[in-house]
Amino acid sequence: VGGAAAGGRRFGKGDWLRDGFGVWYKRRVRAVFFGTPEIAVPSLDALVGIADVVGVICQPDRPAGRGLELKAPPVKRRALELGLPVVQPVKVRTPDFAAWVKEREADVAVVIAYGRILPKGVLEAPRLGCMNLHASILPRYRGAAPITWAVVRGEEETGVSLMQMDEGMDTGPVFAIRCIPIGADETADELAVRVAALAAEVVREDLPRAVRGELAATAQDHAAATMAPLLEKKDGRVPWEKAAREVHDHVRGMTSWPGAFTSADGKMLKVLATKVAAAEGAGAAPGTVVAADRAGVRVACGAGEVAILRAQLEGRKALGAAELVAGRALRPGMVLGS
């Protein structure tokens, strides 16, 4: 489009704007943003830089802390700092909410980690529909917890997929995918920070191209899809019967929710950090503490051993390996998880 309209007339400085999408408009691209947790905040910041954000939708405030006081989600807090209008619908499958979204007259909705499946009426409300930033290399790890499950399953790479949303669970066609490696000892929390930055990069660089029609949306290979289901507390239980590498991946993947845990002397033990001490070999029964010194508490697995570097016994503060050994919280011969 450049600086001239059809027919050769130059766009007047006062009546046309060139927005962050690189397109000349009589107004900037209008966008609504759906997101709730911390991982979505950098994408909101990126979107504000390239479009007029005419509405921010996040989940309701939730009770948190010992006092169970209502706490606003990170996206709400950031949106209010930016002076953006925020709504927190209890239900999204209502005609009133779909009407509210439509009344924003948005060109596009940008969604990242909102936490709910949007109905057809909402998906179709913006002119170009809803575009989702999903934290995986689709079609792998569709679902609510892609970062956690990618780490737990020992993946060496993940990414962010920009997709056109449909009524399914992360099943829509994909505009672009950006990838990053996963460190061998990287936790899910650490990875989430890098994924958040990558998603913001997608917003700044790939979203504008999708809006301009420069990126074709490619259908996913549904036969190759894998799932990343919503996490439950029970998912954190350490599977000592698995190989040492898998146990280590489980611990680093389950941070910080639901947290990796086992039992010791009948009390819950949160396993906060580990390393692979021996990748192979089988000796003691899985879960048996085979050695305990300042370097770590070595625990037998189905194959090999892991060293617990940091843990927290029920009712006590988190301790490093040296403190765990000195206080005899973990001792050779103990069987964890029994």
Q: How should each PLM-predicted stretch be described?
A:
Residues 30, 54-55, 85-104, 117-133:
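Internal alpha/beta domain cores that form substrate/cofactor-binding pockets in large enzymes
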Residues 28-67:
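N-terminal Rossmann-like dinucleotide-binding module
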Residues 59, 63-107:
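N-terminal glycine-/serine-/threonine-rich beta1-alpha1-beta2 phosphate-ribose binding loop
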Residues 235, 241-338:
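An anion-binding loop in the catalytic cleft
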Residues 2-12:
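Extreme N-terminal basic, low-complexity initiation segments
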Residues 35, 56, 79, 109, ...:
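A residue-level signal for conserved active-site and pocket-lining positions in enzyme catalytic cores
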Residues 49, 108-227:
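Donor/substrate-binding cores of folate-linked one-carbon enzymes
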